[in-house]
């Protein structure tokens, strides 16, 4: 029963808003490099009541390869939705919510703006990829898409063990943009200012999934009790030091000494002019001992707690400590993205990069060749190439239906992202199987659940120095028995004088790599050495988005129908 005497006044009338279907399909032709997280779709008009059905087709070409590369790379595609209320703390007040005074909002808000840098943004910047005009300075535009991009990277692409998060402001102030060419560019502070695209992390493997420490937390010690008695026993056998000779720098200097019990003296001795220190007579010393038979022992509960805390820290390292990851790891509960107030994943796909060979059918008088000196390519012309010489081109096409269908209940930004990554191959390390020396280095069922173990630096880069034995990172026990890295040998090695490393994308380090923020980034270098054109972006693509929007709008806006919903 309604508590109001007249229920009519306790309800509000509702109007069913008719919806119309709109074909908002379009293409985006762009260029980019491997390792960059490229925003190739940005729609900031998402409103409550929208339903979006997304299909996508793509054609991606690589700049001409020198040879038909025998390796693996993928184009990864992702779509996310970011509510505006997560990007700007006054979005709800902007829309009319009143939480400061009765009846109506007393403050009029405007969308935070970003001001183009003095000379404008240049090619390859976030602003460029999102469709903001380049090479024009001083104009203003919405800052929310760049906040959305930074939030997506923080929540979905940042390696939380090694990378600092991007700073994201949520206030009302306008900000000045930063260009990709700014020498002081820092992704932490400048991603929201439309500078360079952030880097994606390398695909996880034995090395790239290493942890910086065995557990995420301090080392857990085993409790041994609160106290134990200490006893002292004097030793009556004296020590009669001999005469010591010092160099000239000791002349006239003071030498401190401490005589142990029985003399209990503390003082100093002057050296003489002959630079000698003579005997100081008998010195007696004693022995200190801890009587553990009378020590207070640890309880079973204290020992249990130590093991439980250790297990907790190890799970923190294994699953991650973003709140959604922590809940999944410890409680095995999967929270939806919108519940966790984070960018919501819509859908995506992975497209293998194709490589096609071109067989030469006529001999030529010259051939382009490349070799590496100090890690840099040196190009030269050979006299002749025979028929059957293998060149290459890379053309990747894909059409994906029903990428996602989603209905939205609030205002926000729909953003599509793509990146190219290679599957990493290693050639400079010593596989751990060749370093086993003790029986404990071999697997036994009793050793199955040991803690995270050290991965030595020599496993990824060996140069015969003491640094080979340093710890690179930490990996689950017996990971070497579960994994085998991709390798290259023979003339494929990059350190061979006449190397054929233009045929693969294996890592080639000029110095010892460390598990660090820079190393975990996917970069363009491995692909760069295999392409003939060095001064352009590595990939250029044509992306077609078949975007069907069903929106709470009439099909046409007809002037005069001012009293109709």
Protein language model regions, located:
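Intrinsically disordered, low-complexity segments
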Residues: 2-565
């Amino acid at each position: 029963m309604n508590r109001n005497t007249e229920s009519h006044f306790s309800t509000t009338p509702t109007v069913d808003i008719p919806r119309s279907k709109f074909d908002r399909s379009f293409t985006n032709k762009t260029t980019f490099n491997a390792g960059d997280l490229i925003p190739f779709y940005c729609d900031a008009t998402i409103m409550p009541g929208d339903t979006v059905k997304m299909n996508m087709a793509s054609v991606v070409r690589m700049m001409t390869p020198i040879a038909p590369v025998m390796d693996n790379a993928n184009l990864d595609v992702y779509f996310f939705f970011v509510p505006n209320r997560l990007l700007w703390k006054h979005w709800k007040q902007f829309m009319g919510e009143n939480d400061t005074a009765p009846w109506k909002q007393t403050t009029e808000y405007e969308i935070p703006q970003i001001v183009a840098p003095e000379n404008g943004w240049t090619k390859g910047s976030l602003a460029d990829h999102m469709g903001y005009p380049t090479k024009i300075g001083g104009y203003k535009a919405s800052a929310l898409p760049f906040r959305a991009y930074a939030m997506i990277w923080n929540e979905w692409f940042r390696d939380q063990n090694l990378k600092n998060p991007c700073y994201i402001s949520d206030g009302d102030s306008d900000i000045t943009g930063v260009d990709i060419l700014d020498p002081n560019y820092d992704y932490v502070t400048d991603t929201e200012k439309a500078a360079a695209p952030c880097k994606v992390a390398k695909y996880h493997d034995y090395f790239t999934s290493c942890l910086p420490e065995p557990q995420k937390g301090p080392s857990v010690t085993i409790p041994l009790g609160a106290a134990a008695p200490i006893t002292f026993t004097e030793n009556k056998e004296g020590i009669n030091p001999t005469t010591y000779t010092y160099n000239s720098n000791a002349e006239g200097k003071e030498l401190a000494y401490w005589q142990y019990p029985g003399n209990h003296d503390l003082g100093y001795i002057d050296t003489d002019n002959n630079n000698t220190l003579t005997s100081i007579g008998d010195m007696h010393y004693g022995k200190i001992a801890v009587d553990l038979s009378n020590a207070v022992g640890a309880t079973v509960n204290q020992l249990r707690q130590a093991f439980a805390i250790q297990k907790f820290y190890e799970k923190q390292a294994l699953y991650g400590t973003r709140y959604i990851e922590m809940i999944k790891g410890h409680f095995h509960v999967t929270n939806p993205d919108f519940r966790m107030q984070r960018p919501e994943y819509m859908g995506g796909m992975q497209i293998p990069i194709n490589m096609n060979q071109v067989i030469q059918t006529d001999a030529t008088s010259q051939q382009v060749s490349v070799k590496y000196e100090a890690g840099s390519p040196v190009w030269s012309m050979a006299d002749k190439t025979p028929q059957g010489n293998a060149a290459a081109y890379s053309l990747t096409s894909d059409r994906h239906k029903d990428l996602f269908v989603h209905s939205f209940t609030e205002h926000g930004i729909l953003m599509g992202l793509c990146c190219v990554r290679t599957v990493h191959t290693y050639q400079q390390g010593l596989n751990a199987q060749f370093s086993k020396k003790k029986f404990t280095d071999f697997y036994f069922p009793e050793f199955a659940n040991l803690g995270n173990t050290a991965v030595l630096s020599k496993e990824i880069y060996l140069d015969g120095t003491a640094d080979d034995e340093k710890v690179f990172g930490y990996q689950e026990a017996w990971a070497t028995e579960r994994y085998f890295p991709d390798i290259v040998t023979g003339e494929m090695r990059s350190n061979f004088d006449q190397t054929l490393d233009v045929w693969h994308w294996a890592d080639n380090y000029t110095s010892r790599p460390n598990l660090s923020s820079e190393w975990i980034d996917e970069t363009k270098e491995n692909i760069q050495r295999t392409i003939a054109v060095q001064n352009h972006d590595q990939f250029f693509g044509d992306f077609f988005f078949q975007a069907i929007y069903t929106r709470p709008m009439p099909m046409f806006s007809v002037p005069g129908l001012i009293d109709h919903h």
